């Protein structure tokens, strides 16, 4: 269990780094385009709970993957349908935590309008990827997936 916690923390600190990378990219774009940032203490403080919530949600979801002896990033299809922990509330807690909360939180903390826009624009793309994955999950898990899908929302 301790090793799973360490792996989860390591994996999710990487996602936070990517979130700040997107925010820094946005800051650079703001500078190149002459867009005024909105960096302030209030915006920075507002970003902290978003980032923390995203990290917690991803860590919780990652731990559930590890407890089921699954990889968070895998090219092979899932063999287990996880419906416990954060998966009781969202079918996509990894994406919700990372691609939404962490990315928006980092963008707020750095006060970058471009980073917020990049984050907002990539969510529909991620949603398309999720829909594709869900078709595969339906083929793999059949009726079990359909019952889960009916009970739990994709995002929130």
Write out the residue ranges for each language-model feature.
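Histidine-centered phosphotransfer motif of kinases
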Residues: 89-96
């Amino acid at each position: 269990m301790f090793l799973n916690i360490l792996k989860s923390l390591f994996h999710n600190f990487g996602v936070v780094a990517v979130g700040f990378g997107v925010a820094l990219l946005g800051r650079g774009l703001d500078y190149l385009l002459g867009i005024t940032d909105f960096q302030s203490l209030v915006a920075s403080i507002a970003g902290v709970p978003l980032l923390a919530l995203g990290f917690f949600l991803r860590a919780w979801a990652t731990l559930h993957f590890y407890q089921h002896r699954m990889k968070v990033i895998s090219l092979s299809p899932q063999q287990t349908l996880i419906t416990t922990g954060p998966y009781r509330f969202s079918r996509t807690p990894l994406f919700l935590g990372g691609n939404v909360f962490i990315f928006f939180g980092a963008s707020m903390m750095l006060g970058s309008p471009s980073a917020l826009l990049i984050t907002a624009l990539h969510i529909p793309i991620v949603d398309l990827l999720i829909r594709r994955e869900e078709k595969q999950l339906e083929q793999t898990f059949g009726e079990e997936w359909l019952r889960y899908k009916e009970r739990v929302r994709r995002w929130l």
